[in-house]
Amino acid sequence: MSGKPTLLAIFSLFLGVLLNGQQTATQQASTATDTKQPSTLSVTVKVVNVPATVRDKHGQIISNLAKDDFVLEEDGRPQAVRYFAHDTDLPLTLGLLVDTSMSQRRVLEEERHASYSFLDQMLRQSKDVAFVIHFDHEVELLQDLTSSREKLESALQTLQIPQFNSAGGNSGSQGGNGGGPNNNGYPGGRGGGRHGRGFGGGGTLLYDAAYLASDELMKKQQGRKALIILSDGVDRGSKLSLDSAIESAQKADTIVYAILFKDDEQHDRGGFGGRGGFGGGMGRHGGGHRYPEEERPDGKKILERISKQTGGRLFEVSKKYPIDKIYGSIAEELRNQYNLGYTPDPADAEGSFHKIALKTKNKDLTVQARDGYYAGR
């Protein structure tokens, strides 16, 4: 009889220990859960990226500088370089903007072959993408962002100067209303624009093309970004201004390189007004804008301004400096860029423009970089 109470006491003691252990384990699990899920504060920090190319006094690219070799200012105030890289491992997005107005009819074949060779040389299949846009009286995306060399080559093959029929209408150069092989671009008169942003009209819509390429395509991309414009630089009929085109590239952190092909005969002065002549346009007879000779814009100065303010360069095609050699120079720059970043004042008003000045401590070196950025974008 005396063994039963003892056994009961032992059982009660065991049960108490077990329950206490479960409670302790539960408390520990709760504590562990609390430890794994701390409250967090998310802070978005704006970083201004400044890609740069450095040359010596002979024009040779310098590629062995360190972060401390640079001096960076915003609106005259020194800035600390928070991020610095000098490698080409970042993804690259390239955009080709090809002028297909009548002024470029003599050079289009040369542009086509050199452009494909450049893309074939630059694109890495796993990282890089490119797109092709043509512009004349409309802006059309012939090939959207892709890493496929075959698709890009196909788009370049569709580039043509417009043909005009005997009745004075634009017969279309790329399949009538069908456009190019990827007619999902910004056509002004061939089936609607991408995201509704296409601008149609008469002339050569250079500014519209540059704006749309930056705002619709480049702005969404990460890494290194460069637009290459092949044109004589004279805009006819754009709805947007030169300032708007430059601003869109700056907001998209996109460098613009310009390849200038001069129109020796100035064919468009005779009344074609670009590809939109003899039809289409915005209610103007003959399509496009016809500049009197004394009012004709300086296309070289226009392209120089676009490229300089975005950190790029203007190249002028000549017998001594053909387009394939120019593409080689652009490729060399893209392979030897420095990427600097700094954090601006968060109190800057949204949309306000701020001047950037980047130089090296060595006064014999010249830095090529963007000249500013827009806050809060």
Predicted regions and their residues:
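Scaffold/interface architecture of coatomer-like assemblies
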Residues: 21-377
